[in-house]
């Protein structure tokens, strides 16, 4: 629609690194600049991308999670688990945030502190993120932390922890919205 209306440029924040490839290629063939925000697409058909180094951001999230777990009095000699929630594994930003988190965790977390095997995908739905967080807490008796890789996940985790009055759980999340 923007192209038909004579846009001088297109600004996109891709939630899926694949879904906009064809559209960006068509726009670029018309010599209209494409600027990406926050995530790359799986193509070189864009002019510039302004984004966070999401691997580094994931590492910082893991570092913060470890600090908060230690500060909460969790012993490195006792087993504990941390869960991960994200909106989509089709977003390179999400993939990189998880990758950075897992890499840092593998290097620096006590050996008895583990990441749960199931990473929950909520599809950008806050209610699903709430449900996923509640299931994670119910399923894992050793859960002491939850990492939300995006706003939807962070909001869902915060709502669940608040509803359940779970002050014993450490939460680290991205993209803080007003409701969190």
What are these regions (language model features)?
Residues 1-180:
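A residue-level marker of the well-folded mature domains of exported/periplasmic proteins
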């Amino acid at each position: 629609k923007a192209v038909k209306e004579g846009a001088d440029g297109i600004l996109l924040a891709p939630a899926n690194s694949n879904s906009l490839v064809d559209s960006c290629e068509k726009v670029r063939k018309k010599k209209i600049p494409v600027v990406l925000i926050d995530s790359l697409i799986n193509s070189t058909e864009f002019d510039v991308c302004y984004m966070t180094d999401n691997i580094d951001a994931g590492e910082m999230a893991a570092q913060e999670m470890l600090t908060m777990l230690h500060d909460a009095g969790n012993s490195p000699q006792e087993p504990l688990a941390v869960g991960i929630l994200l909106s989509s594994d089709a977003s390179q930003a999400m993939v990189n945030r998880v990758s950075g988190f897992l890499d840092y965790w593998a290097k620096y977390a006590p050996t008895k502190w583990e990441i749960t095997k199931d990473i929950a995908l909520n599809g950008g739905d806050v209610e699903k993120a709430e449900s996923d967080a509640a299931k994670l807490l119910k399923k894992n008796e050793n859960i002491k932390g939850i990492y939300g890789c995006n706003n939807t996940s962070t909001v869902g985790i915060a709502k669940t922890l608040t509803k359940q009055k779970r002050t014993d759980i450490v939460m680290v999340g991205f993209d803080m919205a007003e409701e969190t």
